[in-house]
Swiss-Prot record:
The keyword Cytoplasm applies. Keywords: Cytoplasm, Lipid biosynthesis, Lipid metabolism, NAD, NADP, Nucleotide-binding, Oxidoreductase, Phospholipid biosynthesis, Phospholipid metabolism. NCBIfam families: PRK00094.1-1, PRK00094.1-2, PRK00094.1-4. The lineage of its organism: Bacteria, Pseudomonadati, Pseudomonadota, Gammaproteobacteria, Alteromonadales. GO terms for molecular function: glycerol-3-phosphate dehydrogenase [NAD(P)+] activity; NAD binding. It is an enzyme of class 1 (oxidoreductase). NADPH binds at residues 14-15, 35, 109, 142, 258, 282, 284. Pathway: Membrane lipid metabolism; glycerophospholipid metabolism. It comes from Shewanella frigidimarina (strain NCIMB 400). This is Glycerol-3-phosphate dehydrogenase [NAD(P)+]. The keyword Lipid metabolism applies. Pfam families: NAD_Gly3P_dh_C, NAD_Gly3P_dh_N. It comes from the Bacteria. It catalyses: sn-glycerol 3-phosphate + NAD(+) = dihydroxyacetone phosphate + NADH + H(+); sn-glycerol 3-phosphate + NADP(+) = dihydroxyacetone phosphate + NADPH + H(+). Its main location: cytoplasm.
Amino acid sequence: MNNAAEITVLGAGSYGTALAISLASNGHKTLLWGHDPKSMQVLAESRSNERFLPGIQFPDCLSIEADLGKALAASKNILVVVPSHVFGDVLKQAKPLLRDDARIVWATKGLEPETGRLLQDVAREQLGEHYPLAVLSGPTFAKELAAGLPTAISVAGTCPQFTHDLVELLHSPKRLRVYANDDFIGIQLGGAVKNVIAIGAGMSDGIGFGANARTALITRGLVELSRLGEAIGADASTFIGMAGLGDLVLTCTDNQSRNRRFGLALGQGKDVITAQEEIGQVVEGYRNTKEVFTLAKRLGVEMPITEQIYQVLYQGKAPVEAAKELLSRDKKSETLKK
């Protein structure tokens, strides 16, 4: 049994493992939990996650645990890195096992399925008001993060001390710069919307529209993110930071992004099911599109790019037709509110 850790990471996929490696590489005792005991045994024996991060060895400070109770007992700092559609279920499982002094941070990017609620609302529903909450987000492809290549992220939360402690835990002079941010809502929203726009950027490139169209789509996607953020009380300046523009540009322009590759396949004429199967991992943007569209409709926020992507994914519209509709929209002023 692991008696103590500075932080426990829930979720042994590519991103959860990469964050655990980064934390342990800083010299912090880190525990990584996954739901499948057999898979976790393989990780423990090989000291690597060959399925998602081949060739990258675990630091000595990284321990593996398949028992959720033991994993949660090991640390007061709990980092949740699971797909958004199981986020609530994982917290529900965790609730009776949490330490009284537990503090919850997540790197999950998305909103609640069907409702479009922010994950902070899901967390409060499952955990109550007792535990401090935080979120981290930014341009972080798992393979590059695990390999020690430099990047930067933002962290925001409900408790200033917890945010400060997370900055200290995560920051590494050689591999990861961490910015504190007081916009808890904006940091969460950026991670969901960028996945949607990345699918659109991939579709644009898959059709063959070129760099000009991709850049225009990214720019107007940022407008949509800012528009939605303003409607739910986010700070507009957040969206020109790491969790907004930073993550958006990364996800829209590099083929390490599953969302972008998914969009590429759609733009090349493949159907949704085939495109998802080709990726072989969770494409968060597929669900995020429905979630973001649901939230925008509920708030009456105009998001034409998101709406067209939704119609491609859920109503069978051809990507070329979606592009035509976007280009033929009424002429208007280029401002965030128009």
